[in-house]
């Protein structure tokens, strides 16, 4: 009877609280959950099943109402992230049909009641791990909350920016830095590369204004000389002091601070230097000529001559001045010429002790029908005895004459005057060769004149330094 009674009575279904109590009792006592559970009455089972059926129907009705368009909510179908959870719908539908079969007592109900307790206990965990589709209204609410949070953050940042003081920069920003030129000439140039610097961006060294003026003056003067007389041209440079014509003892003082061309109408040159400076300069030039690197570059010539000046010509004609040069030791006539002055250029040097006179003359040979013997019995206008040392430097086309001159006025030794003259003479043949081809190439002509002026600058500055050393006590000359 008891077995039949048990078979006729329905099996008890475990509720969620039973499962939880089962797990707790299992952990506490260590016994199985089936032994601790108490059977429920039939009325209690029917009441719980009716309650679960009502809750499932209510959920389906809510879902049906959500799918309609009659409610107050709006469904944003145009959203790109909108999706419908078909798998979840199928699972919920299958769950509802299974509960209906269990209530009607069909085969599905028996199968559900025959499942082991372990599988029933693990079913809530499986459902909790399955992804749940987010409702579109919840998603919209989350987006709105994110936007509101962003607005709040921006509002707070704006308030901080408006009230906070600007911080100090470790490195000043570009708008607060001082302007620096992007192009800096000769910056970061290695000292070893200085030897490779170009003379100019055109690879040409331009002549200064004074050099250009002298070049033009020499060219114009040579052009004015008849071609047949150019071969007798003499270009020489002398050093002395420019004297004012109104006073023979005062040097001119124009308002200039550098070497410049001075008008010859306002001054005259006195070609003379101090004797001690004269001796020291001779020693200086001789020392340069004896240097090892200058071996063979200098030719040294010593001479002792006497020059006599004669005036020739009829009173109705232009007078001619003839110069007769004799060797003092032998008395032999070495040169008999007619010297004509063509032009001269005075250069005033306010920073130096001596000034410069550049003169261009023509030394024409006297015709054979007018021999020197013709003037032997005449008294010369003046005579000059010259003790000269000449240093000829062919590489620069320059001859340096260091001459001690004794002037005899009207041939009387009693009125002798001793002067010390420094003179540079330009090689006439080299100058004329460059002058003849100046139309094809003017570089040679400009180079010759420039080199001549450079040699004159070296001598002039050396004379000045020697003068300072002698007269200011820097050097004692015996």
Curated annotation (Swiss-Prot):
One of its GO terms (molecular function) is mRNA 5'-triphosphate monophosphatase activity. One of its GO terms (cellular component) is mRNA capping enzyme complex. Its cofactor is Mg(2+). Its EC number is 3.6.1.74. InterPro entries: Cet1/Ctl1, CYTH-like_dom_sf, mRNA_triPase_Cet1, mRNA_triPase_Cet1_sf. Residues 62-72 have a biased composition (Acidic residues). It catalyses: a 5'-end triphospho-ribonucleoside in mRNA + H2O = a 5'-end diphospho-ribonucleoside in mRNA + phosphate + H(+). Its main location: nucleus. SUPFAM superfamilies: CYTH-like phosphatases. It comes from the Eukaryota. Residues 1-130 are annotated as: Disordered. GO terms for biological process: 7-methylguanosine mRNA capping; positive regulation of protein localization to nucleus; positive regulation of transcription elongation by RNA polymerase II. Keywords: Hydrolase, mRNA capping, mRNA processing, Nucleus. Residues 1-10, 41-54, 76-93 have a biased composition (Basic and acidic residues). It is found in: Nucleus. Belongs to the fungal TPase family. Heterodimer. The mRNA-capping enzyme is composed of two separate chains alpha and beta, respectively a mRNA guanylyltransferase and an mRNA 5'-triphosphate monophosphatase. First step of mRNA capping. Converts the 5'-triphosphate end of a nascent mRNA chain into a diphosphate end. This is mRNA-capping enzyme subunit beta. The lineage of its organism: Eukaryota, Fungi, Dikarya, Ascomycota, Saccharomycotina. The gene is CET1.
